[in-house]
Amino acid sequence: MFLMRGAAASGLLTGAPYLSANPLGLPIGCQTYPVRKSISTDFAGTMKGLRAAGFTQIELCSPYGYDDFSSLQKYKPQELRRILNDWGLGCISAHWGSNELFQKADESIAYAREFGMTQMAIAALGPFNPKTSQTVDDVKRYVEPFNAFAEKAHAAGIVALLHNEGFVSAYIDGKPVYDMMIAELNPATTKLQFQVSTLQQGYDPVTYFQKYSGRYLSMHCQDWVKDSSTKSGFRQVPLGKGVVDWKAVFLAAKSAGVKNYFVELEEDPALMPLSVPYLKSLKV
């Protein structure tokens, strides 16, 4: 099980977990990618720990598209759902690999439907480490297969989500690729999931929630402080302990139509449970 510290660890050990709390009228969610190593060895135990820490909803990564989640292939989708239900965790969303969505769309959609998911997300379109030679034509080329997948997903009652990492958060000739991609997406079949840490690249969540109100459904939440000793110049901290104005973010998110959010602190998974008390106390 992943390490928990402080109040979150105390709650688990004493049998007094943070119970259901929806400070924004939304479940407190957790992206499971930061705890992927723990999931690979003890899925049920990791889910127990997340629930004890106060999370009531998770977002998975596909067992067939993410190597660190491949141990979950031994479960049928309904079995995974049953384990989550046993621990009182909801799961309506997962991240998928591009090959799963573009080359194996029918199989992936069938898996999601059997699981009971209503959202299928992709972390990025195009390269995760984009080159300066990328062009506007590349943007259109990357969006085209996602629109095709989204049409199939929509017909099956599932929403296709575009997350903004990698090339999606890059710039071409000083212009944001993200806006170019949004312009190419079919708004009838796609929604957006905002990565709050892209504020570090100049993508302000409040600005985007206001600019594209109605297009967003979800977001990943990170907080950080400046730290010159790190390669990025930033260091992640629990939500509410860093530079992000969460009240402003959640107010804008609520107005934009965001229906779920997931804490995702990959640098140190132990920071995620420490974010729960702040989220429980936050009022917007």
Region roles according to the model:
Residues 1-21:
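N-terminal export signals
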Residues 6-7, 12-13, 64, 90, ...:
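Active-site acidic/histidine proton-transfer and metal-coordination neighborhood
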Residues 17-49:
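C-terminal segment of N-terminal export signals and the immediately downstream linker at the start
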Residues 26-31, 58-60, 91-94, 120-122, ...:
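Hydrophobic faces of well-ordered beta-strands that scaffold small-molecule active sites
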Residues 30, 50, 58, 84, ...:
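Conserved, mostly hydrophobic/aromatic
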Residues 47-52, 72-90, 106-117, 147-155, ...:
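Acidic (Asp/Glu)-rich catalytic clusters
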Residues 59-79:
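Glycine-rich, proline-tolerant flexible connector loops at the mouths of alpha/beta enzymes
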Residues 154-243:
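Acidic/histidine-rich catalytic cores of soluble enzymes
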